[in-house]
Amino acid sequence: DSISLVQSYFYLTGFAGKELSEDAFATMDTYFNKLRESGKKAVLRFAYETAFMGRAGTGPTLEDVLRHMEQLKPFLAQNTDVIQVVQAGFIGAWGEWHSSFHGLEKTNDSKRTILEKIVWMTPKNRMVQVRVPEYKNLINKEDQSYNRISFHDDFIVIKPHQWDGGMHE
């Protein structure tokens, strides 16, 4: 037995307001090649911000996020073999969908737009994970992409909490 899945975060912090650079793609490509060489796959998340509770100094606009997803789509398609799943990041602290500098998590319209674009950019043979169960319901249940959305829990749910999606024990 050996490690086969790696939680992988790519922080796009320096790219708010501009295009992703060739150097950024070269760095990600080097990382994916190392995963490929070692027989591992990524649980992949993109994020911009690493602070919360009003401490982030800057963050992406909705337009930044959507533009970067346009750039990332062909790159993810080229690296599908080393991607196990894509987590719906991009918004707020650590891509956890809270505390974003521009308040991207504050309206269902912006969350829905971002989630639909994440599903769009993710290769069709890969699932997308959301952190809170009700985020899946931002997508119309009749939409084929609805069945490609699952969830992950990166905190232990032991008591009722505003972010637990009603899943507390």
Name what the model sees in each region.
Residues 1, 23, 29, 64, ...:
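Acidic-enriched, low-complexity/disordered segments with a strong bias for Aspartate over Glutamate
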Residues 21-31, 62-72, 105-117:
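Well-ordered, non-membrane alpha-helical segments in soluble/globular domains
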Residues 43-53, 72-105:
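Active-site groove signature of glycoside hydrolases
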Residues 34, 38, 71-79, 117-121:
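Alpha-helical structural signal in soluble globular domains
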Residues 15-18, 51-57, 94-98, 137-140:
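Extracytoplasmic/secreted cell-surface and envelope-processing proteins
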Residues 3-50, 61-65, 122-126:
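Aromatic-lined substrate-binding rim segments of carbohydrate-active enzymes
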Residues 1-4, 169:
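Short intrinsically disordered, low-complexity coil segments enriched in acidic
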Residues 85-87, 92, 96, 100-169:
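Catalytic-core regions of glycoside hydrolase
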